[in-house]
Amino acid sequence: MSRFLICSFALVLLYPAGIDMYLVGLPRIAADLNASEAQLHIAFSVYLAGMAAAMLFAGKVADRSGRKPVAIPGAALFIIASVFCSLAETSTLFLAGRFLQGLGAGCCYVVAFAILRDTLDDRRRAKVLSLLNGITCIIPVLAPVLGHLIMLKFPWQSLFWTMATMGIAVLMLSLFILKETRPAAPTNSDKPRENSESLLNRFFLSRVVITTLSVSVILTFVNTSPVLLMEIMGFERGEYATIMALTAGVSMTVSFSTPFALGIFKPRTLMITSQVLFLAAGITLAVSPSHAVSLFGITLICAGFSVGFGVAMSQALGPFSLRAGVASSTLGIAQVCGSSLWIWLAAVVGIGAWNMLIGILIACSIVSLLLIMFVAPGRPVAAHEEIHHHA
């Protein structure tokens, strides 16, 4: 079992590493490519677009051909794209490389969640996804620090060679450690079960909405945090870095505690707790009389996301034993596109950073609480499949 957990964790971590590691080198990249930092900030959106594009096909291919045939090309593409970015001499080539990086990371991301659905029952999957969420929270803190240390001695291209090295490690794991977990092709007797695994299932759609809103909350916070903390609250850059590190610490602590909480409380209780924390955070930020109270509200955001997201993802994948790849892709596309659409619309309409965050917190909590309370799981399916090793 440990091989599946190690491989799944490694496959997922390419996604945040690709986002966060290069940011520290952005000024130097812009200078070398004769582009402005503002022009290269679009590299974040291009990367997410690549991920979304990969998710359009990766899930279906993973369900038809297997998890390894998607993970291996995905990791290989991430390696090639990282090298391509390091060799880019224009901003156009650099952005093209970032899109290809997103494609590779998206393939790996989809496969990771499908593997966990294949190999773990509901309760263990919820615990593992909570742990995975905690580990993922480490990357936004460690990746820029690692990038800074690398750039003390080496040029910015070394950041992408480091990402390529990470991709090589994932490729080796996918080739030699990961065993195929895709359930055997359905027989005629399995057709009714396969047909019943509809993406239009009310319970699945409710969890898609809940997880998409939750990701929108956390990405809105990440995107608005420089404005909130440095411009509105007046913290210095060093203080900002310290606060963000502390919020990551809160996220990790809660994520690592959630598996123990699942041994005591029902998953539904933790999901309700998550949304209550979001609602409390929104109200706290709306009426905050001081910076200290506002910072407390921010910690509630991190705690709320960490306690509920892994559980909600596990519930979303639960109904799918034969179409786990497609379900994972659908979740990923909804989360990436939904959160990006909200942030873009809020900026176009002219909603300020503070109100943008408060608005999504309150909307997420109210909508999600209603869905949790009124949309119950349907008929249970097999919790996980026996692992079949394919030649």
Curated annotation (Swiss-Prot):
PROSITE patterns: MFS. GO terms for biological process: response to antibiotic. Keywords: Antibiotic resistance, Cell inner membrane, Cell membrane, Membrane, Transmembrane, Transmembrane helix, Transport. The chain crosses the membrane at residues 4-24, 42-62, 69-89, 93-113, 131-151, 158-178, 203-222, 245-265, 269-289, 293-313, 331-351, 356-376. GO terms for molecular function: transmembrane transporter activity. InterPro entries: MFS, MFS_dom, MFS_Efflux_Transporters, MFS_trans_sf, Multidrug-R_MdtL. One of its GO terms (cellular component) is plasma membrane. It holds the Pfam family MFS_1. Disulfide bonds: none annotated. It is a multi-pass membrane protein. It is found in: Cell inner membrane. Confers resistance to chloramphenicol. Belongs to the major facilitator superfamily. DHA1 family. MdtL (TC 2.A.1.2.22) subfamily. This is Multidrug resistance protein MdtL. It comes from Escherichia coli O17:K52:H18 (strain UMN026 / ExPEC).
